[in-house]
């Protein structure tokens, strides 16, 4: 009886969530996100500006994005919302929804700038790794991205994304897509920019920042494949993750062209054994052993670049695909 009741509640929650998102799908189409974010070593607070570009499918007076609000010291606080022309807009932030008021005609497009800050409850894992070094890893699957990003947090809602991450310069930053720039600021900090011109779901839209040793393992059909591991695990990590080259080649020959600009294989603090983030897979930090025992895990996560990322779920009841 308890099991049946729990299943019914879960089913009802899924139905209501799907209905809520369907209203948004009928109203707006997000085409691009840009996240500018400041990370620091003093505390777990992030300061961020999100630029969300979208098209209005129907005449609207408001629209909503998912963003977890502040409770018990954690969550995001929105400072202000602006248009691309620097006009302040009225907004409400409650029940983990950011509602922005704006008069728009059907077919109109616009970019909306959201300034916010806070300590993520989850979604962005800020923690010491097994060697005691501080790290930052996005861990959005399946719907935890809204804990640190204002987004339409649904597996079928794809958009392009650009990350502009400023952090202490002892960190290397990895993100979706192609590396655009690494810019030292001369004050012990640096800004790293990554951009995906391929639309991806928010569940696999992430960055990672840590002390990394990085090696290009090889190229397959022009696609660079790299390994990002903790410096203490450099020898074993490069040996283990180099398997990704032959595995990726097999999938390209068997399935079809690789869908993204690169493939980075990253030792991380993900709560999962592995997480198939688009073009930068995050593996458990314990996946590095030096004996290539993670071959099955690596193949599994690389397969998701096609199945789960490029071909993604239409709704929550399909989430088994990833």
Predicted regions and their residues:
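Bacterial Sec-dependent N-terminal signal peptides
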Residues: 1-22
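Catalytic Zn2+-binding segment of zinc metalloproteases
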Residues: 302-318
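Surface-exposed beta-strand/loop patches in extracellular or lumenal glycoproteins
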Residues: 51-72, 149-153, 161-168
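N-terminal, polar/Ser/Thr-rich
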Residues: 16-51, 55-57, 130-135
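Aromatic/His-enriched, Gly/Pro-containing loop or helix-boundary segments
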Residues: 62, 79, 85-106, 139-146, ...
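Glycine/proline-rich low-complexity spacer/linker segments in large multi-domain proteins
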Residues: 22-25, 106, 115-162, 215-217
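Hydrophobic helix-coil surface modules that form long, contiguous segments used
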Residues: 48, 139-143, 151-299, 316
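A surface-exposed beta-strand-loop module
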Residues: 70-132, 188, 193
């Amino acid at each position: 009886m308890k099991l049946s009741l729990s299943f019914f509640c879960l089913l009802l929650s899924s139905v209501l969530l799907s209905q809520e998102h369907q209203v948004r799908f009928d109203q707006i189409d997000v085409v691009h996100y840009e996240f500018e974010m400041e990370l620091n070593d003093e505390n777990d607070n992030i300061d961020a500006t999100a630029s969300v570009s979208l098209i209005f499918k129907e005449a609207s007076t408001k629209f909503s994005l998912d963003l977890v609000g502040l409770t018990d010291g954690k969550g995001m606080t929105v400072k202000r919302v602006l248009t691309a022309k620097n006009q302040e807009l009225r907004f409400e932030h409650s029940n983990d929804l950011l509602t922005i008021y704006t008069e728009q005609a059907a077919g109109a497009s616009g970019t909306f700038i959201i300034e916010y800050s806070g300590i993520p409850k989850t979604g962005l894992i800020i923690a010491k790794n097994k060697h005691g070094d501080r790290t930052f890893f996005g861990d959005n699957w399946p719907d935890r991205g809204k804990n640190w990003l204002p987004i339409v947090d649904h597996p079928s809602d794809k958009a392009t994304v650009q990350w502009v991450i400023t952090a202490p310069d002892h960190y290397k930053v990895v993100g979706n897509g192609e590396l655009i720039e690494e810019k030292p600021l001369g004050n012990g900090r640096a800004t790293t920019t990554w951009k995906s011109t391929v639309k991806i779901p928010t569940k696999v839209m992430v960055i990672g920042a840590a002390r990394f040793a990085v090696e290009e393992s090889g190229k397959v059909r022009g696609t660079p494949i790299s390994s990002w591991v903790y410096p203490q695990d450099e020898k074993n990590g490069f040996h283990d993750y180099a398997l990704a080259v032959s595995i990726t080649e097999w999938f390209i020959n068997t399935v079809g062209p690789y869908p993204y600009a690169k493939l980075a294989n990253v030792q991380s603090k993900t709560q999962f054994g592995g997480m198939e983030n688009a073009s930068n897979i995050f593996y458990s930090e314990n996946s590095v052993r030096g004996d290539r025992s993670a071959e099955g895990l690596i193949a599994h996560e690389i397969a998701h670049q096609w199945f789960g990322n490029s071909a993604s779920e239409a709704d929550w009841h399909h989430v088994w695909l990833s």
